[in-house]
């Protein structure tokens, strides 16, 4: 018989929904709790199931110790006992900064997250350092184990190669890219964020702190599609971003209704035009600037 089953995927719950689940679970348990506890539970919970499990641990602890009210102290104990770690939810910075850009990623639990990307450029040297990423990955198969270089580092190398094709020599500059925050980053989807961070550091033009972006960058300046765009857009909005750039091939019409400005771009030239619209910046202008000015 032909199967008529449909595979259904559920999107990860946002923090507000997880807080509501924790609140309902505590209410059903019939125990009082200090103000703000539901938000603290949501900070540890990767989803509704984690929230319910934490509440069950908390109510059991309160019952064993004869307590009538659950506090943050009990939550910390339950989280440590269950090996829950606070989930990383970064907010946008308060002001723009040269060489700093908001990238977007997806965590292991399927939730989107804001990723700060920092770039420093020094003239008179050469080389590339990328920190805060997964340096290499082990791939195991039936015939043994192989090691693969980090996709994030490969994306950074693509950025420098792209700049060289526009007349800039990477041999004259030392570039350091960093992903702060303690989360090992991998994957090519931070390519456009790294490109923009390096461009900002080169030209000393700050990028708006309310902007976030995602996309892979190709060697000829194309912005390539990536996964997890819906989760990334939700994370950008939650973090306080007001504008997000995504690959044109990832565009969907319903992105008009998200309460955040979503701009599709196909090339890095389009990206720079969208980012530096008021300055009228273009990549060629940035390269001319570099060739005329020493940057330390």
What is the predicted function of each stretch?
Residues 20, 88-89, 97, 121-296:
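Peripheral, non-AAA+ core regions of ATP-driven protein-machinery
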Residues 6-18, 265-266:
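Conserved AAA+ ATPase "SRH/arginine-finger" region at the nucleotide-binding site
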